[in-house]
Amino acid sequence: MMLEHIPVLSAYLFSIDIYGLITSRNMVRALMCLELILNAVNINFVTFSDFFDSRQLKGNIFSIFVIAIAAAEAAIGSAIVSSIYRNRKSTRINQSTLLNK
């Protein structure tokens, strides 16, 4: 693939997931959209790291750190969602006021 195609793909993925995050009413779907946003950013890190300086792996290493942080965020987010589901029996964002108290 040429360099122009990959950032367009990443921007397309990013914009779809931003739309999904804004319009999502389910907490699990919002977490999935957030993970895909981070993956779109990782695609750009790896692409530009490979294109501009293929000898140094700064973009690749940074994307590995982002993946590790995203995994921790997913674990914490899913724990919060399961706790809210146990208490409220719903994963809808607009029905959950548990964290406001």
Swiss-Prot record:
InterPro entries per UniProt: NADH_UbQ_OxRdtase_chain4L/K, NUOK/Mnh_C1-like
Enzyme Commission code: 7.1.1.-
Segments traversing the membrane: 2-22, 32-52, 61-81
Main localisation: plastid
GO cellular component, one term: NADH dehydrogenase complex
Keyword field: Chloroplast, Membrane, NAD, NADP, Plastid, Plastoquinone, Quinone, Thylakoid, Translocase, Transmembrane, Transmembrane helix, Transport
Enzyme class: translocase
Catalytic activity: a plastoquinone + NADH + (n+1) H(+)(in) = a plastoquinol + NAD(+) + n H(+)(out); a plastoquinone + NADPH + (n+1) H(+)(in) = a plastoquinol + NADP(+) + n H(+)(out)
Biological processes, Gene Ontology terms: ATP synthesis coupled electron transport; photosynthesis, light reaction
GO molecular function: oxidoreductase activity, acting on NAD(P)H, quinone or similar compound as acceptor; quinone binding
Membrane topology recorded in Swiss-Prot or TrEMBL: Multi-pass membrane protein
Record localization: Plastid, Chloroplast thylakoid membrane
Job of this protein: NDH shuttles electrons from NAD(P)H:plastoquinone, via FMN and iron-sulfur (Fe-S) centers, to quinones in the photosynthetic chain and possibly in a chloroplast respiratory chain. The immediate electron acceptor for the enzyme in this species is believed to be plastoquinone. Couples the redox reaction to proton translocation, and thus conserves the redox energy in a proton gradient.
Subunit note: NDH is composed of at least 16 different subunits, 5 of which are encoded in the nucleus.
Family: Belongs to the complex I subunit 4L family.
Name by which UniProt lists this protein: NAD(P)H-quinone oxidoreductase subunit 4L, chloroplastic
UniProt source species: Gossypium barbadense (Sea Island cotton)
